[in-house]
Amino acid sequence: MTEQIKKTFLKAKEENKNVLVTFVTCGFPNVDETIKIMQGLQNGGAGIIELGIPFSDAVADGPTICKGNEIALKNNITLEKVFETVKLARDAGVTIPIILMGYYNPIFSYGDAKTIQKAKEVGANGFIIVDLPPEEAVGFREECKKQGVSFVPLVAPSTTDRRMELLASVADSFIYVVSRMGSTGSSATGVINTALPQLCQRVRKFAGDTPLAVGFGVNTSEHFHQVGSVSDGVVVGSKIIDLILKAEPGTAATVVEEYCKYLTKEDPSAPVPKQFQSGGSVATAPPAAVVEPINEMYLPQKYGMFGGMYVPEALTQCLVELESVFYKALHDEKFWEEFRSYYEYMGRPSALDYAKRLTEYCGGAHIWLKREDLNHGGSHKINNCIGQILLAKRLGKNRIIAETGAGQHGVATAICAAKFGMKCTIYMGAEDCRRQALNVFRIRLLGAEVVPVTSGTQTLRDAVNEALKAWVEQIDTTHYLIGSAIGPHPFPTIVKTFQSVIGEETKAQMQEKRKKLPDAVVACVGGGSNSIGMFSPFKADKSVMMLGCEAGGDGVDTPKHSATLTMGKVGVFHGVRTYVLQREDGQIQDTHSISAGLDYPGVGPELSELKYTNRAEFIAVTDAQCLEGFRALCHLEGIIPALESSHAVYGGMELAKKLPKDKDIVITISGRGDKDVQSVAEQLPILGPKIGWDLRF
């Protein structure tokens, strides 16, 4: 299988031609047309077909490829159906190499060895896995080698020489060179990175005779020949998907065949057919700056089997750079002096309140409340935001982007950006913008821009997708200030470090007030920022129970919940190996919670390890139970908690009832609930009767 790819490049070289590498998403616009399109690509002169494995959360792809994915997934395309399509294409006379291209989680879910064996059986020649870097792909590459199937690495303009050497060493057929930073997309303005010759020259220094295929931004025949002058192959994907989207039903195969013939025509100066026209000529740009290589990763990337850096190559170097700056800050007392100098601004230390009436109501253990809701901005999020803003300063970045669900992280980020004079853009799902309109307005009052995300479920998960894409495109000037302990290394460790102030203060305050450690600490769990912030300082204290309260939504016996640790299975999502709510085919499951901040299908890797090792317990709290906790704290303690925190209040109440009266538990009140009053009002007519709460007037 690998040999056929090599022969394709060798034949093209002998004929003094470039290999046209084309891309089409499997099942787009439907399976029958996919096969005809593959025939059309071959008939038009394509030398290799990349057959896309559709994925619900394609963080490296632009809107065109994502639209193809969306249509394919609506057609119920799974990895098994991709294999069936390859077999049908081979039976229909497609003889050129077929490379399966996509994201790792569907493959991980199916099984590495099983995937590779099946691919070989049906006639696929290799794999390009966007978010599986060679460090994470050791076992996968070994199995590919054993089966004679190719594993194609990707390099980007940001790839350092040191890393380039590693990537070149694992290439067994060709190297995919990403011509520019950013997500996938044809070059609608006719712009091709003129630093491409230097990039290809740098790759060849390590690749030797291994062929290079260059992609991202190729649109016209002029592009094809210009890119081909410095490469062995030219990759075209988004433009093909765009043509298929615009084609009349049943004509896509003919359209792409004509387009391939146009791309590879010998005279690129000939007039461009109207249907293939783009907006201009090749632009000039300075060579891409290459960051000096980092010798090593300073900190462990994983918590047991969880964690890692499952990211597109374009993100790798900036994560390495971020880790280096963080590691130096971690061991620099001046950094921590500066961090602590903002404690008065943040409202730290936060209070540890004894909940006397709530304790009496539950009739069991003493209940204490860690009042992160009293922080500046109304939540625990300020801890992480101040810390990461200081890192961004050290990185020399002048712009901040972030995702937000309930808006608490968006508000905290906007606060810090204003305080430090940085531009700020917040990505927020359109549905979350609706149900958290007050926080949207707060963010704008603070001078930040809010970008509503209309893709997918229009919630936190989709906001993370868009923030990651934006970061790749603006990486030189922008820091992605992630709000939870999720994502690729080093983000989970960074967020945990800055949020650990919650647990550290709790430990000291309990010693002062009770001369002992708490018997249990309780926190809500979405991505995991407040929970790991509370839990981490107590990990080694085996006498302290740790209880995480997830969003049970309508109940875990329904599909409408966000209880990742209760109901999820191990997968790879948003750059990290962790527990994920996913379907059997590895596609990410839609989620639901009354609380926008917990409405997320993944979770931080350290929390996954705490579950896997049974160090912490996790329960699912339904929307109705959440409102019970919300009501109890309002009525008994005069505190309106965030709906996120209300999950922990309910879980803490139930735990307190089971424990003796000489025990102490601490519940993290991660945020205040004024942002949620409208949501509660909307939900009470539905959920109120279930808990006997009627506030209608």
From Swiss-Prot:
Gene3D superfamilies: 3.40.50.1100, Aldolase class I (3.20.20.70). PROSITE patterns: TRP_SYNTHASE_ALPHA, TRP_SYNTHASE_BETA. Residues 298-697 are annotated as: Tryptophan synthase beta chain. The modification N6-(pyridoxal phosphate)lysine is found at K381. It holds the Pfam family Trp_syntA. Residues 1-298 are annotated as: Tryptophan synthase alpha chain. Keywords: Amino-acid biosynthesis, Aromatic amino acid biosynthesis, Lyase, Pyridoxal phosphate, Tryptophan biosynthesis. HAMAP family: Trp_synth_alpha, Trp_synth_beta. This is Tryptophan synthase. It comes from Schizosaccharomyces pombe (strain 972 / ATCC 24843).
